[in-house]
Design a protein with these regions (language model features):
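Flexible "cap/lid" subdomain of the alpha/beta-hydrolase fold that forms the substrate-access gate
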Residues: 2-30, 36, 44, 49, ...
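Typically the conserved alpha-helix immediately C-terminal to a functionally engaged Cys/Sec
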Residues: 51-56
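Active-site machinery of serine-nucleophile hydrolases
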Residues: 58-67
């Protein structure tokens, strides 16, 4: 039986590519001439999320896992914004730059929304979808548990600046509370790395909850998710 114990280390080869002046980092490993499996992370993680999964796929597939802009080791876009549209733009160019075809997408959290959106627009380039904790339809506040609703409503208000940009709530509280085991100190240090400095370095983790399509807002994200939800 294969060893599936979690490993805090990430020894997979890393590369980078310049996308519209922004350097995006990504893992690429496995069988170069085999069909690709693309792993897309969400908030507030990075390609590091997939380190243990990739190890079990790399013997038979080409494995790729980008860091979204402003997250992991990827650079920030010059406009300093991290809307769904911004992430989709850079990810589209990343797919083009790496000539991704016949791909299986493995997606989590906001990586699911980005992956579904790309797949809907590029159906001839995918062979499968694997998703977890995914955004498959717009939400209403009635869908939320009361404790989570209060937190996410606060993040969509001025209070979110203090909660996320100063207190780093997504990394320090929400991330470890979302994992069924205790994250190690080494793992936490890697997840903290892009967001060590209070303020704008943490902006991606605040913009994401403000992009969740709740009660029709934001309108553009709601439309996108309604569209790919129907397509799925």
């Amino acid at each position: 039986m294969p060893n599936i114990a979690p490993d805090w280390r990430d020894s997979h080869p890393r590369k980078s590519v310049l996308i519209d002046g922004v350097r995006m980092q990504y893992v690429e490993t496995g069988q170069e001439h085999k069909p690709p499996v693309v792993f897309l992370h969400g908030n507030p993680t990075s390609s590091y999320l997939w380190r243990n999964i990739i190890s079990h796929v790399a013997d038979s597939r080409r494995c790729l896992a980008p860091d979204l802009v402003g997250m992991g080791d990827s650079e920030r876009p010059p406009n300093g914004e991290f809307t769904f549209a911004d992430h989709a733009h850079y990810l589209d160019r990343w797919f083009d730059a790496l000539n991704i075809e016949n791909a299986v997408l493995v997606v989590h959290d906001w990586g699911s929304a980005l992956g579904f959106n790309w797949a809907q627009r590029n159906p001839d380039k995918i062979s499968g979808l694997v998703y977890m904790e995914a955004l498959v339809q717009p939400l209403t506040w009635k869908d939320w548990p009361e404790n989570a609703k209060a937190v996410f409503q606060a993040m969509r208000s001025e209070a979110g600046e203090e909660m996320v940009l100063q207190k780093n709530i997504f990394v320090e509280r929400i991330l470890p509370a979302s994992v069924i085991r205790e994250l190690t100190d080494q793992e936490m240090s890697i997840y903290r790395k892009p967001f060590l400095d209070p303020g704008e370095s943490r902006r991606p983790t605040l913009t994401w909850p403000r992009q969740i399509p709740v009660d029709g807002e934001p309108e553009d994200v709601t439309t996108i998710i309604q569209s790919y939800g129907t397509w799925l």
